[in-house]
Design a protein with these regions (language model features):
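Periplasmic-binding protein-like
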Residues: 19-20, 92-101, 195-237, 247-264
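Acidic, polar ligand-binding/catalytic clefts
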Residues: 59-119
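Ligand-binding clefts/hinges and TM-proximal coupling segments of bilobed small-molecule sensing domains
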Residues: 124-145, 231-275
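General small-molecule cofactor/ligand-binding pocket signal
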Residues: 47-49, 158-160, 202-205
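Stable alpha-helical elements in mature extracytoplasmic
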Residues: 30, 34, 53, 57, ...
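N-terminal hydrophobic or amphipathic helices and topogenic motifs
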Residues: 1-56, 245-275
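Bilobed "Venus flytrap"/periplasmic-binding protein-like clamshell domains
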Residues: 11-39, 51, 97-170, 174, ...
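A ligand-binding cleft/hinge motif common to bilobed small-molecule-binding domains
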Residues: 70-83, 144-145, 171-198
Length: 275
């Protein structure tokens, strides 16, 4: 997008956002290093714009209020379907084999198993955001795959939506909900930080792997910064060795992907309904 400078010249700015998947109040602080890295690597102005929820990040992208976003699999597919020419550029190495954990409060008596935990049907269960790949859509897919029932048929009590992965873990740990599903990475990070006690908030099942997070770019960037800019942006992300930027994304390395990488998620989204 272009802004007018005081001298009348247009200042070109790349605006970047992200899904607020955890610690929703500290987004700008978290993602600023990514904006700083891209600004330096590409020699342009890059500004981080927070999103209040998952849906808002997709709306901003659709309206061209942001031209680059760190999406989950589901939000990425939504953005690609709404903006013709939108391109998934990179994912973390681990995003090509992402997984969800099903967790339960110790009081349920449920323990880790390789078998799908069918007993959660009777429990008070929470997802993360309804647009979360690892916190809702893929867990629901595996419920359907293992039981032949939609989540609304499977759970005796309507499931809750915490809005973010860390909130899911805390709500299950404190007993507000008896069980839940979340990103494996967030659970492991919270355990490592001592915020989640795995004896109280027990990992009971891990899903098979799927493709998830991605950095997706708006086609209008080529109008603003010139033809071939998306390739340059992709390369700058793949080349990123900036520790602060990679830490912000929770990734050790970024790898090239394309829209096809997420076709499996698109197919799952057609099947998972909460109506």
């Amino acid at each position: 997008e272009k802004q007018s400078a005081e001298n009348g010249e247009e200042v070109k700015v790349l605006r970047f956002s992200a899904i607020p998947d955890e610690d929703t109040t500290a987004q700008k602080e978290r993602f600023q290093p990514v904006a700083d890295y891209l600004s330096k690597a590409l020699g342009i102005d890059v500004e981080f714009v927070p999103s209040i929820n998952y849906g808002a990040s997709v709306e901003k992208f659709e309206n061209n209020d942001v031209q680059l976003a760190w999406f989950g699999g589901v939000t990425g597919v939504q953005a690609m379907s709404r903006v013709e020419g939108a391109r998934a550029l990179v994912a973390g190495q681990k995003d090509l084999a992402f997984k969800s954990y099903f967790i339960a409060n110790v009081s349920t008596g449920l323990e880790a198993s390789e078998d799908f935990p069918a007993a959660i049907a009777d429990l008070k269960f929470t997802y993360g955001s309804s647009s979360s790949t690892s916190g809702c859509i893929m867990p629901s897919h595996f419920i359907i795959e293992n039981t032949g029932k939609t989540p609304m048929e499977f759970f005796k009590e309507k499931p809750g939506f915490s809005g973010a992965h860390d909130k899911t873990a805390m709500l299950v740990q404190d007993g507000s909900f008896q069980a839940g599903a979340l990103s494996f990475g967030t659970y492991e990070k919270l355990v490592a930080a001592g915020k989640v006690d795995p004896e109280k908030c027990v990992k009971i099942w891990e899903t098979p792997t799927y493709a998830d997070y991605n950095m997706t770019a708006h086609p209008d960037l080529e109008n603003t910064f010139g033809e071939g800019f998306l390739d340059k942006l992709q390369q700058a992300l793949v080349d990123c060795q900036d520790e602060a930027a990679l830490k912000a994304l929770g990734r050790e390395k970024l790898v090239k992907v394309n829209n096809e990488t997420f076709s499996g998620i698109a197919a799952v989204m057609e099947k998972v309904k909460f109506d």
